[in-house]
Amino acid sequence: MNIGILGIQGDIEEHEEMIKKINHAPKRIRTIEDLKNIDALIIPGGESSTMGKLMKTYGFIEALKNADLPILGTCAGMVLLSKGTGKEQPLLELMDITINRNAYGSQKYSFESELELNGIKINAVFIRAPTVDKILSDEVEIIAKEGGNIVGVKQGKYMAIAFHPELSEEGYKFYEYFLNEVVKND
């Protein structure tokens, strides 16, 4: 499968390496034309306000709202998939959730935590991580919690997580999970 990684800001190279590790082809997405011929898209972590502005400037907001494409959002990607954050910023609004940005505090409060997603254990890296504040419809499934906070959700062809699987040695397991749960079932 060809897995696109939005290449305007964030942990792009790390996601590419994980996609290669599970024997799929990563494709860096820099323009809306690059969205052709991919089977799924990853929106990486980064700074969600900056990413949202760049996505709007380059036409990604409208293009992705109209695309029939499975999407994984990690950290800032989770924020961008949400309906709202309590702050004015461009969002895709594809998932029926609202977000608490930087719920765990500043970068100095980054941490790792063992999470289990449907029997898959991974060491999750949280950096200035968001959490789901509200679930707005029954279509949203909780797939991960950390300390009582919702840090992973799935809705149809969209999956959003607060952590960085690309920074964990066994993070490739999460990409396999995404491809099996969302992309292959689409």
Swiss-Prot record:
Molecular function, one GO term: glutaminase activity
Keywords: Glutamine amidotransferase, Hydrolase, Lyase, Pyridoxal phosphate
EC number(s) from the headed UniProt entry: 4.3.3.6, 3.5.1.2
Catalytic residues (UniProt): 75, 164, 166
Pfam families cross-referenced by the UniProt entry: SNO
HAMAP family, per database record: PdxT
Name of the protein in question: Pyridoxal 5'-phosphate synthase subunit PdxT
Protein's gene: pdxT
